[in-house]
Amino acid sequence: MRESILTIPVTDIFEPKCGCPICRLRDTLEQRTVEYIMGAAMMEPDVRMETNKLGFCKTHFEQMRACKNRLSLALMLQSHLQDMQKHIFTRKKMFEGKTAKQKKVSAVNNECFVCSKVDWGMSRILVTLFEMYVQQRDFRDLFAQQEMLCLPHYDLLVSMCTEDMDKKYQKQFIDACGELTSKYLDTLEADVSHYCKMYDYRNTGANADWGNSKDSIERAIKFLTTR
């Protein structure tokens, strides 16, 4: 798979200042990878070997199924199923252990071609992010201007920065991440609480003021899970 597909300028991800920028990065990498394998790449032998070996998780199967080219998905499924027939569910070999097939199935169940490419792309782009944070004041300002960081990506950035960022800037970066997450958490909690209060009979009626609470359930789930 061409590395250029998984290369995105960091500033392009952070310029919109809407939602979690790391979710935006993940979504962009997912979209590019799915479009790539649902196109002509599905006929490339090296790509087919990888998709046969790794398969796909439910989330990315659904994204692929939503694409218009169902034949591409069917051909990948055909090849993947045939590969499992050949390499997993074959006649038991003489010295094969009792759980050998189960271990192979477990490997397939816990792997995903798209996830592996997204993780690969994100790990490299985030290292670039850390370098930019250290070297460019403008980017530090841009980072601080983001709307929020979701909880899982706060965890990811803070854990990665302790390994991949200049120690001199780690505290400043961790504090910036905490500010983006806690500030949005306060707003979100207030919106969810307001939503709950609107079911009190005293707050009903044609002129009931829901404020920003109507989509607070969906926003809370996305904040907690990235999805």
Language model feature labels by segment:
Residues 1-227:
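Intrinsically disordered, low-complexity regulatory regions of eukaryotic proteins
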